[in-house]
């Protein structure tokens, strides 16, 4: 199966439509994996939300600022296809940010409008909020899941990080299949 577009970028629409609950996408830097995934996440139906995961809380906090958000270039490159968005902390939930459609208020400031499109969090801190309900979250993207050599590993090394990822998937996915629902999907880029 060809998973590349004619322009050489990864065909994330095709990859993310595969029927597997856990997909690992490994490729060179700058091949459109994150960009393409963000396009697909912003195009989810209204009743479906996403969870965008980074390894550490520092990384999640950085991309929770619009100018550093991986969603920003998608919005700016495709203004006719996507509405403006707002990325900010979720009120009353520590360490989780949200992505909303944005609208200008009376003061000309872009503010969140309606329900969140999805959420941003960190693998290193998701265990602190276990037991929450995320039934509306249908897909997760774990961006930059392969650490660079100079990035310190989780306590417990790679096996600790692997266990944290499995716990994250279980926390968000719960028992959907037992209820006859589609499983939560996780795409690791």
Question: Language-model segments: which ranges?
Answer:
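Phosphate/NTP-binding elements of NTP-utilizing enzymes
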Residues: 2-189
